[in-house]
Amino acid sequence: MKRFKRVSAVVLGFALLFSPLAPQTVAEAKVVWGNQELVKGQIGRVTVLKNTNLYNIKNNKLVAARKVTKGQVFRVYSESSKFGGLYGVSKGTYAQKSSSIKYEKAPRDKIQALGVTVTKKSLASNTSYPQVSGLINKPFEASYNRKFLNIAKEAQKEHNELKEQEKEDRKNGWAPGPYSRNMTYSVPYNQDNILSVAVTNDAYAGGVHGNAWIDTYNYDLLKARQISLKDIINNNTKLNKVNNYIRNEMIARNKKGAQFWVNEFKSVNVKDDQFYYTSSGIAIIFGEYEYGPYSNGIHTFKIPSSVYK
């Protein structure tokens, strides 16, 4: 039987306060295309080459809405073949395809840099997982989705095994509470063609308390590859700076009531430690019993990029 224990609601709540599942304010991606910022939902732009009109559609007819002059540029959010070709520049307002305008489709990598679509899927109420769409690299998109589906299937399999074990334990007079294995996720970073997913797990199979842990997955969507912490902290100088930053942060948190065993912290493990991207750098996660008692829970240390660059 797998070594699962019950997660205390209080401790897990404290742990998640510092985890990727805690409410976060993530800055919107800023993507510049030429001299104009690309925005969510934009598919292209039209440049006015000669003075012309923008149009509305009324009673299935094009009606001039306002005049536009040479040099003006408008974001395009939709494209239609009606009336010889229309480009939606705002709600109900269109530029008509003609020699008076030039249409340019936004580069796919620029659109992807604004953030891909992540959809929540569930195998059961206790197991949810992410599926992505909108990636340029479709084989990679399919591979990504299979990976997280398989992770979810394994979690649900473990849950089902625990429920069977619970039945056996109850027959033998031992089952202090419902056994379970839960999985959910958050997306702490989704911009600049980087996607970070944090999978939060907890499990209980009897005992005083259970286990909670976070697995993170970070991807370079343009290169279609997973990013490791070693890719970011790639030399001893950077590693020493990050270690010093975390050590000082532990000391500061201890003054506010945390119980980090600062002397036991020697270094970040760039091969195994979990991390995710933030708008200002990265965040490194330490699990239960890492550098502190169980009551410390799961802790996240946000490292500004200025520390390791």
Spans of features found by a protein language model:
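Compositionally biased intrinsically disordered regions enriched in Thr/Gly
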Residues: 4-5, 108-309
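Beta-loop motif signature
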Residues: 28-110
